[in-house]
Design a protein with these regions (language model features):
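N-acyltransferase acceptor-side catalytic subdomain
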Residues: 1-171
Length: 171
């Protein structure tokens, strides 16, 4: 039942049923970015987002999601060639802070500055508790791409990525 409602969160650690969100997936506003709230949110398919240049946390739960199943990934010939060249080194959780900082750089022309200080701190706390991870792509010891996201059980929720050279974020 979609009633196009947006709920105001309180201090209570709870979310409304995602089916009550608006058609685009906006479910609620307010609340906080505590580890417990973030874990509850992601466990229910809900994620936080700040509207561009606004302070109010928005909680989203779109009904349609893009899901990648590892055993169904097809690596294109050109990507396989790039991997086999050995030009890049890939690491995990070696530079989480660098990844999130680079992802959070203000991109006013794209209205993509949702990853402000509060969000970066929240994801850093998740990382410190083992609930967020990063993937780094290096070229000659220079960070040239990467992504970070939330890890719960066997699921990884990719949040943001960047690439400073062609295809680095695809690796």
């Amino acid at each position: 039942p979609n009633n196009d409602m947006v709920f105001q969160l309180t201090d209570k650690l709870a979310f409304p049923d995602p089916h009550y969100g608006d058609p685009d997936g906006l479910l609620a506003v307010g609340g906080d970015l505590s580890i417990d709230r973030l874990i509850l949110a992601y466990s229910n398919g809900i994620f936080p987002w700040y509207a561009f240049r606004e302070e109010l946390i928005q909680w989203w739960c779109p009904m349609d999601r893009f899901v990648i199943f590892p055993d169904e990934i097809h690596i294109s010939h050109s990507m396989r060639t790039l991997i086999n060249k050995g030009k890049y080194e890939i690491t995990f959780n070696e530079a989480f802070q660098d990844i999130i900082q680079t992802c959070g750089e203000l991109r006013i022309e794209q209205e993509g500055a949702w990853l402000g200080t509060k969000m970066m701190e929240a994801y850093t706390h998740l990382h410190e508790q083992g609930f967020a991870a990063s993937v780094e792509v290096w070229e000659e010891e220079q960070l040239v791409g990467g992504l970070y996201g939330v890890t719960l059980g066997r699921c990884f929720f990719g949040e943001s990525m960047f690439s400073l050279v062609p295809s680095a974020s695809k690796l």
